[in-house]
Amino acid sequence: MIRILVSNDDGVNAPGIKALTEALTEIATVLTVGPDRNCSGASNSLTLTNPLRINRLDNGYISVHGTPTDCVHLAIRELYDGEPDMVVSGINAGANMGDDTLYSGTVAAAMEGRFLGFPAVAISLNGRKFEHYQSAAVYARRIVQGLLAQPLAKDQILNVNVPDLPLDQIKGIKVTRLGARHKAEGIVRTQDPAGREIFWLGPPGQEQDATEGTDFHAIANGYVSITPLTVDLTAYGQLTALQNWVDKI
């Protein structure tokens, strides 16, 4: 039977990972390994200065005192008896579109699976109330089944964003590119109860590029967005111009 590793960045007890695990258990043997706390914004960070501690939970999940990337790396390298056929990360409580992907622990967990040689998908639910995890779970299962039936190129990650809508209100799937946000809003300066100065990072910026063809546009119009991401960050279109610049300095 197909074997799928499920992880996330919201934590192993988050509702999204539960909905995803249950949906994929219908088609595969699932191992669920997630952080023991919310690690949103962890990106691709690894824990290198402390040991990783795990806890095997009563529901069969494994919690890790580490980052999403730690979870996937540890699961594949040590916790799995053999190897998974695929890595699926999510369902994230919140969008991972445009610039979000660089900060996202959800995308990073999928990326680690891709680094280690496995097909990988990141699933996120875009909304404010996060009421329709089941809608995202249905699309996650559909996409995973599609990948199993017709595998895609091995150098890509599928970044999937689902609008927080009832299933019958979602219009379908759009293949998209990443949009872009304006820079994040300002830092919030305040004090703790002892009067010491503390700071909170402001919320992400509003959409800057949400034109047709972007993930932002698809979600705003009631579609699921699928964006292929690559691990290779090289700006190939700039290589010649950069070489010409280097030759002159």
Swiss-Prot record:
Q: How is the cofactor bound?
A: Binds 1 divalent metal cation per subunit.
Q: Which cofactor does it need?
A: a divalent metal cation
The answer to keyword Metal-binding applying to this record is yes
Q: Is the keyword Metal-binding in the record? A: yes
The record's section on Pfam families has: SurE
Q: List UniProt keywords, sorted A-Z.
A: Cytoplasm, Hydrolase, Metal-binding, Nucleotide-binding
Per the record, the domain of life is: Bacteria
- InterPro entries, sorted: SurE, SurE-like_Pase/nucleotidase, SurE-like_sf
GO molecular-function annotation terms?
3'-nucleotidase activity; 5'-nucleotidase activity; exopolyphosphatase activity; metal ion binding; nucleotide binding
What is the annotated localization of this protein?
A: Cytoplasm
Q: Where does a divalent metal cation bind?
A: 9-10, 40, 92
- Which reaction is catalysed here? a ribonucleoside 5'-phosphate + H2O = a ribonucleoside + phosphate
Q: What is its EC number?
A: 3.1.3.5
Name the family the entry cites. Belongs to the SurE nucleotidase family.
Q: What does this protein do?
A: Nucleotidase that shows phosphatase activity on nucleoside 5'-monophosphates.
Q: What is this protein called?
A: 5'-nucleotidase SurE
Taxonomy of the source species: Bacteria, Pseudomonadati, Pseudomonadota, Gammaproteobacteria, Alteromonadales
